[in-house]
């Protein structure tokens, strides 16, 4: 059975992700107590169910300590994938304000006796980060701070299409002026490269458009940086695998996240697709949903 566990911070899009999996034919359960999960998996497997998605959040805090052991146990018999959704505190506060929903931990008792009840939304968010932090290392993290619901649904569908027998690498382009991604394991700054933005004909385009590709592809310094990053990844990927890492997010940043970082993320993704499962995501580039988050398939490989 394939089991997808969705966890992370409240307001980061867990319900959207769960709904996307339900549309994809998964048997979905929201806020399941972790200790019930093995029994549910056995029951559904006996009943012929082959796909299960479960959302787990801080309301299950009493059982969260059990999750690492449960994930290891389930992985012996099932294809288990963990998706950890995150977002900046500012983005979460804005979402809760817009929806007028109450945070699950608002009004709960703080772990610090001197603080007492968690009176503010920001306190509740930070407390939840502490509670679910141990689960982040088991899952593929994605920062939804700037991600719209339809883009998240598309990304989740791409995520479950990947084979689960090897390290999954996500190349994520972004713009430093919009903040660094929270989900990055490795980050490379490509702002030292010539910027197509200063060519007025290229300014409205992205690193996916042929004129921008031609501009950057003609520069030896661009290929030098790509070669250096690729060499670094090829050297260290075996060590990430040996460390039992299932997911690795490689963030590529330029000023606006529209030209250089997009081109380099695409180029590196195509190269590395020979050696790992690869997803590419463009966080800040003005591209359509399918282009902003997609698998790198055989046809993309040089």
UniProtKB/Swiss-Prot annotation:
Pfam families (UniProt xref): PapZ_C (PF22740), RapZ-like_N (PF03668)
InterPro entries xrefs: P-loop_NTPase, RapZ-like, RapZ-like_N, RapZ_C
Keyword Lipid biosynthesis: no
Keywords on record: ATP-binding, GTP-binding, Nucleotide-binding
Binding site for GTP: 57-60
Keyword ATP-binding: yes
SUPFAM superfamilies: P-loop containing nucleoside triphosphate hydrolases (SSF52540)
Role of this protein: Displays ATPase and GTPase activities.
Designated name of the protein: Nucleotide-binding protein Bcen2424_2795
Organism: Burkholderia cenocepacia (strain HI2424)
